[in-house]
A protein has these predicted regions:
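Conserved ABC ATPase signature
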Residues: 1-19, 41-46, 112-113
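Flexible loop/turn segments at secondary-structure boundaries
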Residues: 1-2, 26-27, 42-43, 83-85, ...
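GG-anchored amphipathic helix commonly corresponding to the ABC/SMC/Rad50 NBD signature/C-loop
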Residues: 4, 12-34, 53-63
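Long, contiguous hydrophobic alpha-helical segments, chiefly transmembrane helices and signal peptides
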Residues: 5, 9, 14, 23, ...
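Walker B catalytic acidic pair
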Residues: 37-38
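C-terminal lobe/lid and adjacent interdomain/linker elements of RecA-like ASCE P-loop ATPase modules
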Residues: 46, 50-156
């Protein structure tokens, strides 16, 4: 017998199903902001890049998709996968700091907008690399993303 999806699907599977539905119904959906929390759960880099491309397309920014009736959405995505994060037009990091407050401690959340240079450093860390070769890999990945965004490269 069929069971409720909430009982059998992981959070990542549910998010990817939502992405598939939103991608299919984007032209008819007027929801201004879509939030995906760890949609990369259980997937690798190659699939992560494809998911990143699909999320980016939901913004209506893909060639031939803006201005032709497609609903443009603001997409917020929480991810740990650099291949997916590379598709973002803006990149933020979120960190937590423990602050001493008298005898107690308080957790403080910090959201930081990354510059282009800081973004490369963050994506390199997300890749698990700390070398110049890792940095070059990130720069190459961002170059490929730029090609996808202009329509010069198609991911399969």
């Amino acid at each position: 017998p069929l069971k409720p999806m909430a009982r059998v699907a992981s959070g990542g599977e549910t998010a990817r199903l939502m992405l598939a539905l939103k991608s299919t119904l984007a032209h008819a959906d007027a929801t201004p902001t879509l939030i995906f929390d760890e949609i990369d759960q259980g997937i690798g880099g190659r699939v992560g890049a494809i998911v990143g491309q699909k999320l980016w397309r939901l913004t209506g920014a893909a060639p031939g998709e803006n201005g032709d009736g497609a609903a443009a959405h603001q997409v917020l995505c929480i991810t740990h996968l650099p291949q997916l994060a590379a598709f973002g037009d803006h990149h933020y990091t979120v960190s937590k700091q423990i602050l001493a407050q008298g005898d107690a401690e308080r957790t403080h959340t910090v959201v930081e907008t990354l510059t282009a240079e800081a973004r490369i450093a963050e994506l390199t860390q997300m890749l698990g690399a700390h070398s110049e070769a890792g940095r070059r890999s990130v720069e190459e990945m961002l170059g490929e993303v730029a090609q996808v965004k202009t329509g010069a490269l198609v991911l399969n």
